Every structure is written in C-alpha cells, then in structure tokens.
Swiss-Prot record:
Gene3D superfamilies in the cross-refs: 2.60.120.20
Sequence ranges of Basic residues compositional bias: 19-35, 45-57
Region called P2 globular domain, residue ranges: 424-646
Keywords from the named record: Capsid protein, Clathrin-mediated endocytosis of virus by host, T=3 icosahedral capsid protein, Viral penetration into host cytoplasm, Virion, Virus endocytosis by host, Virus entry into host cell
Name of the protein in question: Capsid polyprotein VP90
Annotated GO CC locations: host extracellular space; T=3 icosahedral viral capsid
Region named Acidic: 647-778
Native source organism of the sequence: Human astrovirus-6 (HAstV-6)
Length: 778
C-alpha cells in the first residue's frame, strides 16, 4: 500500500459489484461499479525519519485511506458501539458410533449466541442485538478447553469448520476438510481463529439483526463441530461417555443503526436428552416430525410458538410463525427412518421445524420439517417423493437427544402478550380444568351394564386408602381407567401437567402405590342435617397393585318419582379382585354420608356404602351408574394442593368446594339445634354483611319468605360466597319458623338503652324454653 516514506502513496479501490474476466477489461470504463483513487503524500519534511516516525507515517497513511474509503461508502456505516464478550456455549460430547457425528452448530447472530441450558438470562451481546438493526464481527476465536487429560481417552478427533451459509448440507469428513477448518486432538486446548474476511456480511460487511428478515441477510456464517471415531476410555476397556471440550466464543461484535426489538432477547435455547422422534410422509406431502407431547422439547416449543398469522386452505394444516433449529447430537440420527428424499437432511444432524397448529395425535406433537431457514420463513416445507417401507414404518420410535434453538420472534415489541400455542406452568394450589379421556372398563365392569364399586371398608384383601396418612383418608369406591389427561387453566388455556400433590397418596397395605395429581370434593345437602360428600382423585400408579373387595352397584329405588336422590346401593355383593397397572391414569372416587351441620373445607371420612340410605347422583356418582363410553371425555375442575385439616373439627386449610348451578343446590333449613350448638363468636363479625340482607317482615307470607330465601341463597353462591356462609346469611335475613323464636326476642331488646349482651342473654333464654320439650341443652 505504501512505498518509501519520501514518495507519494496511491491507493485505488475498484468496486464493480461483480467479478469480471480479463477479456472484458475495456468494458469497465462504462462503469457499473465505483472506483476510488486516493493519493497520499507521505513525505515528512525535515530530518531523516527514524523507526518511530516511520510507524507514525504508516499509521497516518492508513487513517487517511480509511477516512476516504468511509466517505465513498465502501466500508458501510460506522459502528455505533462495539462489545467484546466471551460466550460459553456448552460442552462437546463423546463419539458413540465411530462415524461422523455433529456435536454443535453455532449460529453467530448475536441474539442466537446462547448456551443450551434453557436459561432465560441474557448477556450484553444479546441486549445490544435487540437494540440495533445491524451487526458484524471484527474477529472470532472459538476456544476449545479440554475437559479430559490427553491420556484419559483415545480414538476420537474433533474438527471445527466454518459454514459460510448457515444451511444444512450432506457433508462427509472429507467434505468438512474442504472448508476452512481446524483439527483438534482430544486432551489439548485449541483456538479456531476467524478474520473479518471470513465473517463479512452482504451489506458492506454488515448483517441484519432481526431474524424475521431474509435468512441470507441475518444469520451470518455458522461454526460446526464434528467428531470422528468412537471415544474409548484409556483406563477401562469400555466406551467413554463424558464431555470432551468446553466451547467458548471470544469475539468483538459491532452494532449500528438503533432499532429496538425487545423480544429478541427472549429467544430460547435448550436441550432434551430423552425424546422419542419419528418421521412420516408420503409422495407429494410435507415431511412431518413427531415427538411426544409430554416431552420437554414439545412443551417448550408449544409454549413459545405463536399462532399463525396466515390462513390455511381447506383441508390443510397451518404452521406456527415461530421457527426452531433442531440439532440431533446423538448417534441415533443415523437410525432415524425418514421418507425420501430427505434422508440426508436428518442424517446431517440439524434442520428447521415449525409447530403444526392444533395437531396432536396419539399423544404426539407434529412439526413441519424445512431444509433451510429461508424455506421455513417462506413456508416451504420439505416435500417427500415417497413413503417409508412397511417394515421400516413399524419400527419403534428412536430415543435421541435434541438441542433446539428458537430462531425468531414474530412479535418484537413489549406490547400485549401474543396469542400462543403454548401451555402455562401451573402453580401449587392452583385450580385446573381437567379433560379426561375414558379408557376401557376395568374388569369386572362391562359396557352398558351397571358399574361395580367397592362397597365395604373392611375388604378381604389389603385396604386401599386415598389421603394424607392412615388417620386422614378416604376409602376407595369407584374406579375408572383414563387414557389421556388434558390440563387447562381457569381461563381454559392449555397448561402443563402439574407435579404430584405433595402429601397426598394412594396407600395399599400401608405402602404408597400411586401419586395424586388433582383432587376435588363435592358436598350436596340431602336433608337439614345430612350431606352427601363425594371425593374425586386423579391418580397415576407408580407400582402396580390389586385389591380384593366386596363389590356392588347403585340402582334406582323407584320409577315413580323424578327425585335425583332416589338411588340406593345393592345389598348383595360380589367378591372379586380389581387390578391397577403401573403408569396408568385412574379416576378414583369415595362417597360418604355426613350427619350433622355442614362442614366447610375438606372432610376426611372412612365409611362404607350403606344399604338403607338413599344417595343422590352428584358430580362423582354420575359416572358410576354405567361405565362411560370408551374414548368419551369427562370434565372436572380440580385443585392441585393437599387438603389440610385443622384440629378440633374447624375449617380446613383449603376449601375445595366448587360452585354449582342454582338448581343443583337443595335449600338447607338449619334448625335451632344446629344453630345453637355450633354458633361461634366469629359470627358477630358478619353483622354488617347480614344487615344488608335483613329484609324480614312479619307481614309477609311463608311462600314469599321461602322465595326470597331461594333468591338470596342463589345470589350469594353465584357471587362466590361459600355454601355455609350463604346459608347462615340467608337464615338470618329470612328466618325459618324454627329460627324465628331466637331472632325475634333479640331484635325486640336491641333498643338504644339496652346492651347487646343483655339482648343476647334474653334471646338464649327464650330459645331454651321453646326447645326444652325436646331435651335440648344450650
């Protein structure tokens, strides 16, 4: 660039836009490109230059040239900010097959440079990438730090290579050697160095940051790491399965063009080490990847994928607008059966997918497969030219390891939360809506016949308890096999499967047999002093077990009335065994009759089904008359927190009573015995609330009072007031004939000159006199 220091320096830059052959040199004068000619006088008048002055002169020339190049627009915009950073990306695993295996594919766009741990934290590079529209790299060093000694393992070599297009390809070990690459020996540290000429973008060296734009302008090059040769332990005659290297990127990213896209910092990168993967497709149809809906990969993708913004044609499926890169880092990539002609894509180790909206079959989530990121943005899935053979189609799903990266975020601003296909993560104690798919009837039950239920609490075999411990439990009555469980939030948005309820279990012979995932208890008054309490539990069996019991079934007591409570349990029983299998879901029920005042909160009772008692068809028993049809669905609202019972028979720590419709609540008439015996001082705190509804008038007819009672009770329940509290308020506002003697003396004595204690004492005495004939003691 420079001659001797006492001469002029001339720099000529030709930017013709495309390369031309020497035979077309004359046509360059017609000028489609741009020519920059710079002349610099580097002569320094005065004494002869020493070494320091020569360096200063060279720097002066360099600065002048760079300034002129920037003026001509040859070097692109000036960086607004530069950030040096070292990003830790994860580890390189061992080779388990002996063939070429891909271990990592590193995309260099700053918003995609994250570790694969699933962490939601972001560093300065991601933060700047979300604030500026363009980026470039001054340099890049890929550091491989050995995690094992040089003599600890043998048989494997590692190759780090540069992929300029960030597009999957079918590349052998020799093909990787044709790229710019570095071979690394296991046990030794290494650095793969890349210069700006290797990393320049299409816009005068710059790349776009927003990954929703064209793929060729945004992704930048990628760094791929492969291994060859099975990794063996030098100390043991067996395969080594640990990590070989820690991978870090040391670089300086430059940014320009401020344009804030906050959501770009929220892109997710994670790893699922145990996931079953299958591929399907036929001639002329898109290639589809299937993974279990319960897997970490499927749940994360479903939660983060946004709804499609375009409409599909009739009969077609729509795909989400969110694109995911999938990297298969296990040997099973070669074992995956793929319809032609994209076998090479899957065996290459990485590809792109989009979630198919609403498609869940046999418990699997489905994804369209794309051969490049640009194809994914353009909605051009890989089309199959044929299908897999019959023998291959019947092979079981392959267990593999998937490393996945969220490539884009269609909604880039803060704004409102976008509509997603995802599932929320339930919190402990949250009430969830549960949709249960019914399986085949459990023997001895049969379709279209009465449902057998456990009747006695002292079975010939081991007793099955559902509860907290051997003191607080319910006895198993009804049992229904469930083949599929769908969880939803209270707003009916899809939710993840909650963790098992801590402290709640199914005990068989005093040993834990199953986990309880959700529970519900329904209380329905039958008479003034009797309630039917049905507890419902959704469980999954951890250890298969069986229970031998005396079974019976419910039957209609009379056909001449429409009373819903007119069912009874058959007195004759059947001695048989019911089996529960490991890993299966079951809906278990327990029904008891509670005599006494209504009890708020959860009630633990151990009571067998009684022959001479009438039962009502409540929310739990309604599924125990005949087995529900196979594949039909049952809906419940259930809680995910263990019910805590207070000592002394007080309220429980959790109320699991769900609101019912108006016609499902028989009106409970609380007599003077119950009110007198169970009234507490806490009722005084509700005086203000009761007075709002104190509409009692002696001139009203009994029918009007009863209608007012029904209206008020229904209104309170619909407003979220508990059943017990609503009943107490209703009794005070519109007293029954038994309740009036206690209320009226108190009202008469509540004059301004009398105290509340005197009035209450007088009311109690009057009530005792009225109830003395029944032998009731206050």
């Amino acid at each position: 660039m420079a001659s001797k220091s006492d001469k002029q320096v001339t720099v000529e830059v030709n930017n013709t836009g495309r390369g031309r052959s020497k035979s077309r040199a004359r046509s360059q004068s017609r000028g489609r490109g741009r020519s920059v000619k710079i002349t610099v006088n580097s002569q320094n008048k005065g004494r002869r230059q020493n070494g320091r002055n020569k360096r200063q002169s060279n720097q002066r020339v360099r600065n002048i040239v760079n300034k002129q190049l920037r003026k001509q627009g040859v070097t692109g915009p000036k960086p607004a900010i530069c950030q040096k950073a070292t990003a830790t990306l994860g580890t390189i695993g061992s080779n388990t097959s002996g063939t070429t295996e891909i271990e990592a594919c590193i995309l260099l766009n700053p918003v995609l440079v994250e570790d694969a741990t699933g962490s939601t934290q972001f560093g300065p590079v991601q933060a700047l990438g979300a604030q500026y529209s363009m980026w470039k790299l001054k340099y890049l060093n890929v550091r491989l730090t050995s995690m094992v000694g040089a003599s600890a393992v043998n048989g494997t070599v590692v190759r780090v290579s540069l992929n300029p297009t960030s597009t999957p390809s079918s590349t052998s070990w020799s093909g990787l050697g044709a790229r710019k690459h570095l071979d690394v020996t296991v046990g030794k540290n290494a650095i793969f160095k890349l210069k700006p000429s290797d990393l320049g973008g299409p816009r005068d060296g710059w790349w776009l940051t927003n990954t929703n734009d064209n793929a060729s302008d945004t992704l930048g090059p990628s760094v791929e790491i492969h291994t060859l040769g099975r990794t063996m332990s030098s100390y043991q005659n067996q395969q080594f399965t640990g990590g070989l290297f820690l991978v870090e990127l040391a670089s300086e990213w430059c940014f320009t063009g401020y344009a804030a896209n906050p959501n770009l910092v929220n892109l997710v990168k994670s790893t699922d080490k145990q996931v079953n993967v299958t591929f399907e497709g036929s001639a002329g149809t898109p290639l589809v990847m299937n993974v279990p809906a319960a897997s970490h990969f499927a749940r994360t993708v479903a939660q983060r994928s946004t709804l499609p913004t375009s409409m599909a044609r009739a009969g077609e499926n729509t795909a989400s607008d969110t694109v995911w890169q999938v990297l298969n880092t296990a040997v099973s990539a070669a074992e995956l059966v793929t319809p032609p002609p994209f076998n090479w894509l899957v065996k290459g180790g990485w590809w792109f997918v989009k979630l198919i909206a609403g498609r869940v079959r046999n418990g699997n989530r489905s994804f369209y497969v794309y051969a490049s990121y640009q194809d994914a943005l353009s909605n051009k899935p890989a089309l199959c030219t044929g299908s897999t053979s019959g023998s291959m189609r019947t092979r079981p799903a392959v267990m593999t390891t998937l490393q996945f990266t969220q490539m884009n975020q269609p909604s880039l601003g803060h704004g409102e939360t976008p509509a997603t296909l995802g599932r929320s993560i339930p919190t402990s104690g949250e009430t969830l809506k549960v949709l249960l798919t019914v399986g085949n009837p459990i023997s001895p039950n049969e379709t279209n016949k009465q449902t057998w239920v456990n009747k006695t609490i002292e079975p010939p075999g081991a007793v099955v308890r559902i509860g907290r411990d051997t003191q607080h439990y319910c006895t198993l009555n009804g049992f229904t096999l469930i083949t599929k469980v769908d969880w939803f939030t209270e707003e009916f948005q899809p939710s993840e499967e909650p963790a098992p309820v801590q402290g709640l279990m199914v005990l068989g012979d005093n040993h834990k047999k199953a986990d309880v995932y959700a529970a519900q208890q329904y209380k329905n008054p039958i008479t003034n002093d009797k309630q039917e309490v049905t507890s419902v539990f959704l469980v999954r069996v951890n250890e298969g077990f069986q229970v031998t019991n005396h079974l019976s079934y419910f039957y209609r007591n009379s056909v001449n009335t429409d009373a819903v409570e007119n069912i009874k349990i058959r007195s004759a029983t059947r001695h048989t065994t019911v089996r529960f299998y490991q890993g299966s879901w079951y809906l278990l029920t327990s029904t008891v009759l509670h005599t006494g005042p209504p009890v708020s909160g959860w009630l633990w009772m151990n009571q067998e089904l009684q022959n001479d008692q009438a039962y009502i068809i409540d929310q739990g028993i309604m599924h125990l008359i005949t087995p529900p049809p196979v594949s039909s669905q049952i809906y419940f609202e259930m809680a995910t927190l263990v019910p805590q019972t207070r000592s002394g028979g007080g309220e429980t720590g959790l109320e699991l009573v769900m609101g019912l419709s108006d016609d499902e609540y028989p009106i409970s008439h609380v007599n003077d015995e119950e009110e007198t015996e169970y009234e507490t001082e806490s009722d005084e705190d509700e005086t203000d609330e009761v007075d709002r509804f104190d509409l009692c008038c002696t001139s009203d007819s009994e029918d009007d009072i009863e209608n007012n009672r029904v209206t008020l009770l229904s209104t309170l329940i619909n407003q979220g007031v508990t059943v017990d509290r609503a009943t107490m308020i209703t009794n005070r506002a519109f007293p029954t004939p038994n309740y009036k003697p206690r209320r009226e003396p108190s009202n008469d004595l509540l004059a301004p000159s009398d105290c509340l204690a005197t009035a209450r004492s007088h009311a109690c005495n009057e009530t005792c006199q009225l109830s003395g004939s029944r032998g009731h003691a206050e």
